[in-house]
């Protein structure tokens, strides 16, 4: 198996390096990742300038672009043979609920799926970085399952792992995305010259986080595996919108 591995924390991030080492025990691994932290880059592509890629001494490739750039460049411009799968992570910090809309980790996996490949995004529910090995083991277990039963078409697995030793993980649950309240307000400050600057506020608190959600699974000590897709169409609303558009007198 040939795996393309990327992330949004940067090519030197310990989560990526831990996962690369684990994956190399079962597969041929090609690392193509951003040259720096690109958290929150979502699905953005670099269009206004060329991308530069540099191969490091260990064979990994760093790119001065976004996670989506990295996967797109690797598959369509760098790799001589197409990978069998794209994996993104291990991200430092969870990507659950509405967070997936902003996540560069999820976006890298999504780009792989968009280019026709099975894809997994994996994150750990902490920024401390003590238990990346638990997340790596969860990915290896998923790969074994995928060897017996491939993913349904157009499916990305968004995996979130509790920040626990593997011996304390309770199991694995299939989940849906939870939801948060809206984000906290922007934080206003001033630069050294007194000019206003703004920091993005913290994510909103959990709102829909009951049983069945990714939030609940991880909080309960389970690995959360959420199937997501590229197609954002809300099919159950098409007829409603069609009727709304046919209304000749909106008033």
UniProtKB/Swiss-Prot annotation:
The keyword Ubl conjugation does not apply. The keyword Metal-binding applies. GO terms for molecular function: 3'-nucleotidase activity; 5'-nucleotidase activity; exopolyphosphatase activity; metal ion binding; nucleotide binding. It comes from the Bacteria. GO terms for cellular component: cytoplasm. It is an enzyme of class 3 (hydrolase). Pfam families: SurE (PF01975). Keywords: Cytoplasm, Hydrolase, Metal-binding, Nucleotide-binding. PANTHER family: 5'-NUCLEOTIDASE SURE (PTHR30457), 5'_3'-NUCLEOTIDASE SURE (PTHR30457:SF12). Nucleotidase that shows phosphatase activity on nucleoside 5'-monophosphates. Belongs to the SurE nucleotidase family. This is 5'-nucleotidase SurE. It comes from Thioalkalivibrio sulfidiphilus (strain HL-EbGR7). The gene is surE.
